[in-house]
């Protein structure tokens, strides 16, 4: 009985370990001063195409990515948004699949702070822009694809949020100085 229990626990651990998503990071800076690291785990078992887009943009392996890109929209008690790899002002950005790609699914919900979700201009318009929730945002369910979550550095997300305004225009220049895969 004891041996069987250990084997069952071992299987549970190995199954959950195999479901862990890829891990990526940002090292953001405020007005040129690095403020720490944000680490994410991607839901590549739920939304593999969306997660791969973000991972590849973190590494810059396609020739462009998030390094040097600002958080251009920050609204306290809502979210921080970035990822405009073209224009850097919120009006650009492209995916690794071309200009835009379709919403993969809406399985994951905006039910807590620290979620990574695709910013878009309506259905099936995902590019490179993303946001990180700072509170639960259930009104976004079914409209934006959740594809990962913050695993370390939520204090850094909250620090970035503190530079936000009701209009979304940041009160400081906040840039992703480094990004990559862990």
Curated annotation (Swiss-Prot):
Stored PROSITE patterns: CSA_PPIASE_1, CSA_PPIASE_2
Effect of residue 73 to A: Strongly reduces in vitro PPIase activity and in vivo protein folding activity. Reduces binding to cyclosporin A 2-fold
Pfam families: Pro_isomerase
GO biological process, one term: protein folding
InterPro entries in alphabetical order: Cyclophilin-like_dom_sf, Cyclophilin-type_PPIase, Cyclophilin-type_PPIase_CS, Cyclophilin-type_PPIase_dom
GO cellular component: cytoplasm; mitochondrial matrix; mitochondrion
SUPFAM superfamilies: Cyclophilin-like
Span of the transit peptide along the chain: 1-20
Single GO MF descriptor: peptidyl-prolyl cis-trans isomerase activity
Name of the molecule in the record: Peptidyl-prolyl cis-trans isomerase C, mitochondrial
């Amino acid at each position: 009985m004891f041996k069987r229990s250990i084997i069952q626990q071992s299987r549970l651990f190995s199954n959950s370990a195999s479901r862990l998503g890829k891990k990526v990071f940002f090292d953001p800076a405020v007005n040129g001063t690095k403020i720490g690291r944000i680490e994410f785990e991607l839901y590549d078992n739920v939304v593999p195409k969306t997660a791969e887009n973000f991972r590849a943009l973190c590494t810059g392996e396609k020739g462009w990515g998030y390094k040097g890109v600002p958080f251009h929209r920050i609204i306290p008690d809502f979210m921080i948004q970035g990822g405009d790899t073209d224009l850097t002002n919120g009006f650009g950005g492209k995916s690794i699949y071309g200009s835009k790609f379709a919403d993969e699914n809406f399985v994951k919900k905006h039910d807590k702070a620290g979620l990574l979700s695709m910013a878009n201009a309506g259905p099936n318009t995902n590019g490179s822009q993303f946001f990180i929730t700072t509170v639960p945002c259930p009104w976004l369910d079914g409209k934006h694809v959740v594809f990962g979550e913050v695993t370390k550095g939520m204090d850094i997300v909250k620090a970035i949020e503190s530079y936000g305004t009701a209009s979304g225009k940041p009160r400081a220049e906040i840039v992703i100085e480094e990004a990559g895969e862990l």
